[in-house]
């Protein structure tokens, strides 16, 4: 905590901060075999990040989308071969991984999940809890993962699925800021743009089948109004919206996802908590995306450095659009669907997500310090009474984030540039000259 405050106060450099807070995990060859299964959420994710880091050192170029099945097959074969070889190095070479996992935050995140879901005791035949959760927390200052939990804690000798990065689920409305709203804020929308919430002939309905009429965009996001997201996405086009997710390495975008249903989270495969955390972290980071990892460096048995992490930033959203999205999502916490997750003494922004029949619940949000994404549901999708983004996911998010920010100074979000009256008047004049609004939902 002391080092964190010193870093934010500018008294120590980022490198000094990590030297002071870094955790060491020494990897040794598993006792039984190189393929022995690993139970810890930290271990599974760390091994994966470290293996991919060594692949990167070998010059491997990671890809997620391909022009043909032949190209995809060829890539998959090359990936599997090198992944296996690099993982064998980790297990047999006496390597040490220096990771950015904060063990105190890891404990807090695990406890938040376990405590919130302790009332759900049903288990599957293999002894795994049916009701599950996963979450990822990212340090916004560095871009590194500081905590990752792949499921509820329980005694098991079997392989434990790390749902935080190995499972893909429907995100519901939590995807709207990344896929619809921030892209449209780049194209001229503002938090105050008036949009029309009305019943659509061929589109979704709102909760309780109620419609608010002419409302500011801020209100539409805060109350997760489906018709507005649908209309704005229709104007944006799925192709344009999904490209933002691809630019942030969302790995499971399928051909069938190029429909308006994805504006409400209706994906073929889905997204992972890790992807959602890194996407929201990009919004907090003024639109700059950083590939998530927990590996800082790797050394061999002779203490020679074989890998040093260097996170590169990629602009995904324009700065002002990202800041406007952040400002809008503070309203989600103040007066919208995320009210129950609002932190007591720390400015925060976030978004809920709930899928059809309450099979999945999400809460994704951030402060200036940390971004955390939480998913709750069953491994085999099942309707859960009272499951929504504003219930169990929000409870987990708030419990963890409250603990993570204990003792930290309150930090306000950075302001966005206000549109000048001249710009607004010119915009209105152009719309009138063309006798139609420049945006599908804009009410003149």
Language-model-derived ranges and their functions:
Residues 6, 109, 142-143, 169-195, ...:
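Active-site SXXK
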Residues 2-10, 20-23, 27, 53, ...:
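Structured segments of extracytoplasmic/periplasmic soluble domains
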Residues 205-206, 237-278:
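Mid-domain, small-residue-enriched loop/turn segments at the edges of structured enzyme/sensor domains
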């Amino acid at each position: 905590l002391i080092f964190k405050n010193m870093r934010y106060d500018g008294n120590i450099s980022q490198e000094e901060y990590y030297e002071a807070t870094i955790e060491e995990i020494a990897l040794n060859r598993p006792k039984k075999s190189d393929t022995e299964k690993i139970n810890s959420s930290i271990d599974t994710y760390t091994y994966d990040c470290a293996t991919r880091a060594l692949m990167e050192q070998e010059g491997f170029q990671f890809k997620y989308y391909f022009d043909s099945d032949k190209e995809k097959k060829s890539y998959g074969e090359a990936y599997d071969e090198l992944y296996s070889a690099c993982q064998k190095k980790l297990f047999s070479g006496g390597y040490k991984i220096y990771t950015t996992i904060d063990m105190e935050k890891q404990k807090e995140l695990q406890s938040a999940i376990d405590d919130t879901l302790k009332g759900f005791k049903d288990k599957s035949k293999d002894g795994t809890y049916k009701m599950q959760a996963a979450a990822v927390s990212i340090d916004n200052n560095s871009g590194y993962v500081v905590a990752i939990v792949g499921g509820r804690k329980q005694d098991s000798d079997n392989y434990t699925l790390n749902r935080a990065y190995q499972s893909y689920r429907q995100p519901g409305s939590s995807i709207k800021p990344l896929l619809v709203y921030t892209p449209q804020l780049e194209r001229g929308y503002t938090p105050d743009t008036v949009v029309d919430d009305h019943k659509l002939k061929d589109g979704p309905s709102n909760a309780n089948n109620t419609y608010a009429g002419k409302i500011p965009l801020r209100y539409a996001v805060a109350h997760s109004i489906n018709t507005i997201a649908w209309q704005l996405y229709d104007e944006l086009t799925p192709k344009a919206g999904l490209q933002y997710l691809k630019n942030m390495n969302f790995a499971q975008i399928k051909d069938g996802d190029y429909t308006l249903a994805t504006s409400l989270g209706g994906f073929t495969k889905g997204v992972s908590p890790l992807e959602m955390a890194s996407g929201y972290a990009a919004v907090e980071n003024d639109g700059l995306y950083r590939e998530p990892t927990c590996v800082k460096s790797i050394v061999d048995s002779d203490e020679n450095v074989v890998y040093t992490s260097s996170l590169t930033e990629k602009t995904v959203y324009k700065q002002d659009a990202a800041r406007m999205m952040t400002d809008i999502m503070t309203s989600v916490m103040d007066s919208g669907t995320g009210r129950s997750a609002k932190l007591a003494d720390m400015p925060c922004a976030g978004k809920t997500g709930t899928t059809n029949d309450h099979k999945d619940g999400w809460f994704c949000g951030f402060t200036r310090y940390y971004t955390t994404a939480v998913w709750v549901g069953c491994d085999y999708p099942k309707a859960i009474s009272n499951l929504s983004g504003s219930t169990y996911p929000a409870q987990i998010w708030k419990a963890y984030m409250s603990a993570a920010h204990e003792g930290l100074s309150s930090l306000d979000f950075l302001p966005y540039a206000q549109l000048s009256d001249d710009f607004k008047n010119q915009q209105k004049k152009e719309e009138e000259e063309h006798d139609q609004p420049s945006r599908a939902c804009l009410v003149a």
